[in-house]
């Protein structure tokens, strides 16, 4: 099987929940821009986190919606937001839900912002399947090029950046 633009086939049988979800249901503001990153928290480095906090400062009222991992990472992330002069309440965590609901709730976000050293893999495919655009920064190694591969394969190369300045 030859895959010219990506190494990772995905299946088109994943169902999105038909349950009506609102931003309020997810603890998100109804009228704000929602940046989202559902990658595992251990993929977040200070490089992208600094950019994300600058984005929150630039986009009035916006929030960052992250995957809930454990209480320690949540506390540390909120503490780091505050250290960067961002109200920690603007960082919202998404708890675990069944896959169909997880896929559907991504439609409540406006933009998926990727991590750098270890891009979203399946997470990017899920976001794209849900209709959520993904912005990534391509790197040198395999793990830092996966989201770009997926974006190329769906015809969205303009969402692939080559440096932090363009990503921001």
Where are these regions (language model features)?
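Catalytic binding pocket for nucleotide-activated donors in carbohydrate/polymer assembly enzymes
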Residues: 111, 115-168
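Short hydrophobic-acidic sequence motifs that mark active-site Asp/Glu residues
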Residues: 2, 34, 112
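Short, well-ordered helical secondary-structure segments
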Residues: 15, 31, 100-103, 117, ...
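Short acidic alpha-helix that forms the nucleotide-activated donor recognition element
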Residues: 98-109, 125, 129
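Short intrinsically disordered, low-complexity coil segments enriched in acidic
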Residues: 1-5, 168
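Conserved catalytic-core segment of nucleotide-activated headgroup transferases in glycan assembly
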Residues: 5-94, 98, 105-107
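Structural signal for short hydrophobic segments within the conserved structured cores
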Residues: 1, 92, 158-160
